[in-house]
Amino acid sequence: MSNADEVTLKMAEAEDAQAVLQLLRQINRETAVVMIDHLSSLTVDDEQAALHEISIRSDCLVLLAMLNQQPVGIVTITKVDEEANAGELGVAVLKKYWNQGIGTLLVNEAIYWFQNYSSLAHLVLDVFKNNSRARHLYQ
């Protein structure tokens, strides 16, 4: 990434479905730590419907880091515990863009959304013990 390149953030919308699926599949190939059930069988129509539903809720978030109009990272907050009203944060960045502050930018923005716009009471985070990059980011 050159100095002239600027990363922007955008809320994922239904029309981003194909790009989101491509991003998630690429990240899954690069890291094997993205945990999305049935990722390989998700269709663009499925993802469009999911992104539309998320866009009208206050307990879910999908935010994209964009570079030259292409997604290079993603952060999600998904409601995981109805009783506790808790959401789980997940973040992933294409390997080519690691160590450039994109993950930190995404996490900070997700926390801001949680604190200012979310209807969730709690935010939780699970990290694989061997994922030292993620542990460092979240600390």
Residue positions per predicted region:
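Acetyl-CoA-dependent GNAT
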Residues: A14, Q26-L94, V107-N108, W113
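A short beta-loop-alpha structural element at the N-terminal edge
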Residues: V7-Q22
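Conserved active-site alpha-helix within GNAT-family acetyltransferase domains
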Residues: Q100, T104-L105, N116, K129-Q139
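Amphipathic alpha-helical recognition patches that constitute DNA-binding helices
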Residues: A19, E88, R133
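Glycine-rich phosphate-binding loop
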Residues: Y97
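Conserved GNAT acetyl-CoA-binding A-motif
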Residues: A86, F114-D126
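Short acidic N-proximal helix/loop "leader" segments that mark the beginning
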Residues: M1-N3
